[in-house]
Amino acid sequence: MSMKSKFMYVGIRVTDLERSIDFYTNTLGMKVSGRSKIEQTKGETVGLQTEKDGFTLELNYYEKDSPYNTKYVVGEGLDHLAFKVDDLDKALEEAKKAGHRTILQMKADGGRWAYIEDPDGNWIELF
């Protein structure tokens, strides 16, 4: 018999906490749901939630002298995060105005989606 579980959130490491909070709140419209300093890791964590469905993204930042502040490698084990938006063209225009470049735009099977980068280079899918 397997364990019963419920998926709760995704945590990503960031190199500049305030810059990342700005991106996820001002570009993607998420809201800060919590913030904590963690002495054991010499770090800080910030919870962000989407308004529509309550999805939670956890941003994890570690001070320079933290043993958890290791070389940052974009994409190691993480492909992308996806967000549904009301208007893809408007979302891309707003991201561009905020200084975030569109990496790729796709069309297939009657759908459209695009990828932008967060401040640490993680790919963010908008559809």
Per-range role (PLM):
Residues D16, D87, D118:
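Acidic di-acidic motifs
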Residues R19, L88-L92:
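Short, conserved charged micro-motifs
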Residues S20-T25, A95, G121:
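Conserved active-site tyrosine of GNAT-family acetyltransferases
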